């Protein structure tokens, strides 16, 4: 999987599934956690948190791609 493929998947899902009270980073984190199970490893092991810090979404997705491709 490439970064662009994951980004497209996540942002497409965000358009139809994100609750209005979620920030973008919350949705990205929860989506990745549910679909791929790597969000917590990226947050805690890699130290990249987009759940609380929306500005980290790009770095978070990059780290997720690396972990997804290692599976």
What are these regions (language model features)?
Residues 1-29:
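N-terminal acidic leader/helix
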Residues 3-6, 34, 61:
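Generic detector of leucine side chains in alpha-helical contexts
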Residues 12-17, 34-38, 67-70:
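Surface-exposed polar/charged interaction patches
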Residues 18-58:
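Acidic, low-complexity, intrinsically disordered interaction modules
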Residues 52-71:
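Charged low-complexity stretches with an acidic bias
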């Amino acid at each position: 999987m490439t970064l662009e493929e994951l980004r497209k998947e996540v942002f497409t899902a965000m358009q139809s599934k994100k609750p209005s009270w979620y920030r973008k980073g919350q949705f990205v984190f929860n989506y990745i956690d549910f679909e791929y199970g790597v969000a917590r490893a990226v947050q805690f092991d890699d130290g990249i948190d987009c759940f609380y810090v929306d500005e980290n979404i790009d770095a978070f997705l990059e780290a997720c791609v690396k972990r997804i491709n290692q599976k």
